Amino acid sequence: MMRSMFAAISGLKAHQVMLDVTAADIANVNTVGYKSSRMTFRDSLSQQQRGGAAPGPGQGGSNSAQIGLGSQVGSIDNLMGGGALQTTGNTFDVAISGDGWFRVGSSTAPAVPTAKEYTRAGNFPPNDQGYLTTQEGLYVIGRTAPAGAGTDTLIQIAPGAGNISIGQDGSVSYQPTGGGPRVTAGYISLAKFENQSALERLGNNSWAAGPNAGPEVVSTPGGTYGITQAGAVEMSNVDLAAEFTNMITAQRGFQANSRIISTADQMLQDLVNLIR
């Protein structure tokens, strides 16, 4: 009887985590670049009541008898599918149509950040020195040349520059003050990972490379990395219909486990009453 209560308690805890994951997704339904999560369950230990036996001469075998001891959180997976692109018309809003990740970091300009973070939230307003930054002030890491060539660099727009544009190849160019040919300030760089689901959330739309993600592979937009769409941002990939379904599932699972506890408690109460 106590087994049933402990199993139900583990079910309550697991379904509470499921509801927590669902709530976080719904709360971020309009967060730029947000990636939703999914929780899976797995069973806990099982207590063996009777061992199994192999068939013998003149008789068949028998299966073991085991009683499960509840459930637990199996995994919380990051769902890295792309979100819808929302047109903003802002020159410094950039969305990725593909699998790449923007590379950002903190440093003292013009030094390139050594500790890198990754994001899909591509709203990059320039700071007072003209460097492209995130909303949190992290520098956008670019490349001095397209594709696999060049080295890492920060992307700086010259003071007074006009006609600023960001191309599908990640190139950031502008018309310098006083005229003359257009200047390419750099190329927005993108990173890919063998297992991008292993990236770890840092908050503020940033991610870190987890130990199971593999090394970053850097390039500029193009190919499987995706192209950059200027004047747009990637919205959250949260599927509200799926999240509401998960919410109902978590609620009903929580209620069912609560009923198990109530039933076991009533049985214990009946047993106590028999003793009186």
How would you describe each model-predicted region?
Residues 1-152, 159-276:
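Amphipathic alpha-helical polymerization modules
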